[in-house]
């Protein structure tokens, strides 16, 4: 027992004297390692009489516990001192710029849709939506599109079967909205549409915004005034607008709308016209009592003109170098 107390005292002194983790580990090996002093005491138990081994073993294990606790406490103290010394030695350069958190931005097409919705919303137009998989009635028949019209061929339209297709315009939303309500109507219908075309100015999927106003005594002059104000608002300057006679199955009379660019050339931006009486009849509205106008615009087309982009496909290639310009 006396010998164990001496070992504990010696170990405690060595532990307190250790000035580094390396020195402390050397003390651990000296007393607790395979050839350590306390390990040797355990190995010598076999030499004792059987009646003394149990008590002696308990005392040796108790001594090991005391030494282990002392080593653990000293290790914590040395680690804390080492950390404090490291922190004291290090300096923080407060002039170093922080890491910039990069903000995202809206896609230019989304920006354009929101701008259109805001303008027409201030004029009292609601925003309506409809399915992108459309049936022939809502996509063609109700819009006065003849059975032999080229748009009904698979050269222009993505068909699932003869009666179901990816919608080629958001005009079907106009039909559904009128089917489910009663005049007057005043709404726009933004959304994705699909046509079988792909080049510098066309993609198989693009965005359209169509609008409609149906009420008593609606006339073409009102349509012209609204679209002129819209285009000036959209381009944020007074623009020269031209209405050219055109043909659409669902409007009569019909017109295409151009704006004069800075180079003096006319650029087509949208189509419009007075709602054809057959369209009103297809949804149960009396064309003798009600009239209306409709218009439609390609969102990407307007976005290209507003931001000076000359290739429509850039909007869908997800090139961050391109998209970051619109933050």
From Swiss-Prot:
Major subcellular site: cytoplasm
Residues that hold Mg(2+) according to the record: 252
Family: Belongs to the class-II aminoacyl-tRNA synthetase family. Phe-tRNA synthetase alpha subunit type 1 subfamily.
Reaction catalysed by this enzyme: tRNA(Phe) + L-phenylalanine + ATP = L-phenylalanyl-tRNA(Phe) + AMP + diphosphate + H(+)
Domain of life: Bacteria
EC number: 6.1.1.20
Annotated protein name in UniProt: Phenylalanine--tRNA ligase alpha subunit
GO molecular function list: ATP binding; magnesium ion binding; phenylalanine-tRNA ligase activity; tRNA binding
Subunit text: Tetramer of two alpha and two beta subunits.
Swiss-Prot/TrEMBL keywords: Aminoacyl-tRNA synthetase, ATP-binding, Cytoplasm, Ligase, Magnesium, Metal-binding, Nucleotide-binding, Protein biosynthesis
Cofactor-binding details, from the entry: Binds 2 magnesium ions per tetramer.
Recorded name of the encoding gene: pheS
GO biological process, one term: phenylalanyl-tRNA aminoacylation
Organism name: Vibrio parahaemolyticus serotype O3:K6 (strain RIMD 2210633)
GO CC annotation terms, alphabetical: cytoplasm
Cofactor: Mg(2+)
Cellular compartment(s): Cytoplasm
UniProt-listed Gene3D superfamilies: Bira Bifunctional Protein, Domain 2
């Amino acid at each position: 027992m006396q010998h164990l107390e001496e070992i504990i005292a010696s170990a405690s002194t060595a532990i307190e004297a250790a000035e580094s983790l390396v020195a402390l580990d050397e003390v651990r090996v000296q007393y607790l390692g395979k050839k350590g002093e306390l390990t040797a005491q355990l190995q010598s138990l076999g030499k004792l009489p059987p009646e003394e081994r149990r008590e002696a073993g308990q005392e040796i294990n108790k001594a090991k516990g005391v030494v282990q606790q002392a080593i653990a406490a000293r290790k914590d103290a040395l680690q804390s001192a080492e950390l404090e010394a490291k922190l004291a030695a290090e300096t923080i350069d407060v002039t170093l710029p922080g890491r910039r958190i990069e903000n995202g931005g809206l896609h230019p097409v989304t920006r354009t849709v929101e701008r259109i919705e805001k303008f027409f919303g201030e004029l009292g137009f609601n925003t309506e939506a409809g399915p992108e998989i459309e049936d022939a009635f809502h996509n063609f028949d109700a819009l006065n599109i003849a059975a032999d019209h080229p748009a009904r061929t698979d050269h222009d339209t993505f068909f699932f079967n003869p009666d179901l297709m990816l919608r080629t315009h958001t005009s079907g939303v106009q039909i559904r909205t009128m089917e489910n309500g009663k005049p007057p109507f005043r709404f726009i219908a933004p959304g994705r549409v699909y046509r079988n075309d792909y080049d510098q100015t066309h993609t198989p999927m693009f965005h359209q915004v169509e609008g409609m106003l149906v009420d008593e005594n609606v006339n073409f002059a009102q349509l012209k005034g609204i679209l002129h104000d819209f285009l000036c608002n959209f381009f944020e300057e007074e623009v020269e607008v031209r209405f050219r006679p055109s043909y659409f199955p669902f409007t009569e009379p019909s017109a295409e709308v151009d704006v004069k660019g800075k180079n003096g050339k006319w650029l087509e931006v949208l189509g419009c016209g007075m709602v054809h009486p057959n369209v009103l009849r297809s949804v149960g509205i009396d064309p003798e009592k009600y009239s209306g106008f409709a218009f439609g615009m390609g969102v990407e087309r307007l976005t290209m003109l507003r931001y000076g982009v000359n290739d429509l496909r850039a909007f869908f290639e997800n090139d961050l170098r391109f998209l970051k310009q619109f933050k």
